[in-house]
């Protein structure tokens, strides 16, 4: 994750474009949370990348879409009493999520082709942006692969595929954010000496693991099972955490265990950030920003859990995880600039 030694000098248009793409990903993550929490994701039973851009417009078309939905496990086991009006609401939420995905893809692709044609990008950047374009395409396929898992014999999507879908979004966001930072933040004015970056890599790694764990929590509906916080409750014992055999399957299949791990990692990240700030005395703006965002994220997570996963709160919790991840990347970027500045000052 070397994001310093290759600082990029690009035109203002490229910087704005990268920023818009990052915002687009965040909006997608937020809308994706709403789509999942409103149980809208399985309402569209086909994947049509081109003609799927047009929604049903007549009553006959809507009825045809509902008939397709009636063949799904979700309809058979959960929503068999759904009216056409209610179905339209679910359908339009999923439709908007897919439409936004197409728009974000085009917002990346069209300016990329333009900047490449105008020779505004270096050869290295072109190669990296081709990778991002490929990942965006794969993400579309991954989204359908996830939805398909809920159309066969279970009324919900695979939590593994849900986690893969979210992690792929995180990878795309990371690449866009990294290049945005490289193009915008070149130098800083600060005299603090930081000799080791290991702790910052640990923070980034833990946040990434936490986002993965959060996806598993969401996919397993772990936040809805009990209002006893596993980490704090005396009602949750070892047998609850390890009842699946072999024991390691609990790590990714047992909702109680996954929720427990999610809480422990959150506490661990907080402890490491506080130690870095107070004990290691890395008192720089990105460190304070990370701590502030972490406290906001912890608050959102606790409120989401206590209030039975309300849609807006839970969606904010999901997108704030990406913003927290972005702040950790910014922190590492800043620290590496400090190291370069320190070496230059010594010379």
Curated annotation (Swiss-Prot):
Listed transmembrane segments: 14-34, 96-116, 129-149, 162-182, 199-219, 260-280, 287-307, 311-331
- Give the EC number(s) under which this enzyme is classified: 1.17.99.9
EC primary class: oxidoreductase
One Pfam family of this protein, by short name? COX15-CtaA
The main location is membrane
Q: Which InterPro entries does the entry mention?
A: COX15/CtaA_fam (IPR003780), HemeA_Synthase_type2 (IPR023754)
One GO term (biological process): heme A biosynthetic process
Picking any one GO molecular function of the record gives:
oxidoreductase activity, acting on NAD(P)H, heme protein as acceptor
Cofactor names from the entry are: heme b
Please tell me where heme binds in this chain. 262, 317
GO cellular component, alphabetical, reads: plasma membrane
What keywords were assigned to this record? Cell membrane, Heme biosynthesis, Iron, Membrane, Metal-binding, Oxidoreductase, Transmembrane, Transmembrane helix
The pathway this protein participates in, as annotated, is: Porphyrin-containing compound metabolism; heme A biosynthesis; heme A from heme O: step 1/1
Q: How does it sit in the membrane?
A: Multi-pass membrane protein
Q: Where on the tree of life does the source sit, at the highest rank?
A: Bacteria
Please report which protein family the annotation says this sequence is part of. Belongs to the COX15/CtaA family. Type 2 subfamily.
Role according to the record: Catalyzes the conversion of heme O to heme A by two successive hydroxylations of the methyl group at C8. The first hydroxylation forms heme I, the second hydroxylation results in an unstable dihydroxymethyl group, which spontaneously dehydrates, resulting in the formyl group of heme A.
Q: How does it assemble?
A: Interacts with CtaB.
Q: What is this protein called?
A: Heme A synthase
